[in-house]
């Protein structure tokens, strides 16, 4: 699969909040990138998605009962 197709899939997953899948897709895209700038971009997006996953961005937690 070419870089651009995988990058598009990664971006769509990221926009949908599927950060685990997006991080894996960005990592794979980085490995396919022919241009250094594309590789760096994909690595940065992967790192952002991994951070979002760790910090549970977009996860709605139930309120604790008092």
Regions found by a protein language model. Give the residues of each.
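Conserved small-residue packing positions in alpha-helical repeats and bundles
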Residues: 10-11, 30, 47
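Hydrophobic/aromatic side-chain positions at a characteristic register within alpha-helices
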Residues: 14-15, 34
């Amino acid at each position: 699969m070419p870089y651009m197709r995988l990058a598009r899939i990664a971006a769509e997953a990221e926009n949908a909040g599927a950060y685990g899948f997006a991080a894996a897709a960005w990592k794979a895209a980085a490995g396919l990138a022919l241009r250094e700038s594309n590789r760096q971009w994909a690595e940065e997006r992967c790192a952002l998605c991994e951070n979002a996953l760790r910090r549970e961005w977009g996860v709605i937690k139930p309120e604790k009962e008092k």
